[in-house]
Amino acid sequence: MMFRGFLRWCAARPEYREMTDRDAGKAAAIVENLPSNTRRTDALEAAQVPGWWAGVEQLSNRTASAYLRALLLTGARREELAALTWANVDFQWRKLTLADKVETTRTIPLSPYMAQMLAALPKAGPFVFASTGKAGRITDTRASHAKALQSAAIVGLTIHGLRRSFSLLGEAAGAPAGAIAQVMGHKPSAT
């Protein structure tokens, strides 16, 4: 839960440690008034991918279509991919450099399909997934995603569920869990 996560973050910082009661988030008065701490499990099953893919390809917004497919193909977080600039796409050496959520970057492979898909996008500014909106880049594709889900008769798949799908489908295909985690930007595990 975000509140408990924030308390743990504060407790880990020397400048906030003395002001923080790490167990405050476990108090009954707080726990009773916050939503349950359940883990989301939405992800595409292998058999659902063709229908979802076809639904996404039919979207009239070509940028949203490419963005949604790229989320599934890379396992990237929404904002990492939305903020991708042309300067961070290396078509020659087939790699993408993503700015991740902890202010570092990671480089991932750019598949031939993905390279072709990105090259077909209009270069209307610095962002790969450009938009005419205030941000200059794609910001919310939930409506487009909902259309694709409806056409594929898939219920309950969130945008973040595409990230989970990347991981689960990669494991099902036999990719090593460590390689999947590295591409997704997860911290290395000691296990």
Region annotations inferred by a language model:
Residues M1, A12-R78, A82-A83, Q92-W93, ...:
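Basic, Lys/Arg- and aromatic-enriched nucleic-acid-binding interface segment
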Residues M1-C10, L110:
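Non-catalytic DNA-binding core/recognition domains of DNA-processing enzymes
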Residues G5, A83, A143, L169, ...:
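DNA-binding alpha-helical recognition surfaces that contact promoter or target DNA
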Residues F6-A11, L121, G170, G174:
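Hydrophobic recognition helices of helix-based DNA-binding modules
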Residues E15-Y16, A76, K123, I154, ...:
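Helix N-cap/coil-helix junction residues
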Residues A43-P50, W93, P109-V155:
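Active-site/catalytic core of tyrosine-dependent DNA strand-transfer enzymes
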Residues R69, L73-E80, G161-K187:
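C-terminal catalytic core of tyrosine-transesterase DNA break-rejoin enzymes
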Residues N88-L96, G156, A175-T191:
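Short, polar N-cap/turn motifs at the start of nucleic acid-interacting alpha helices
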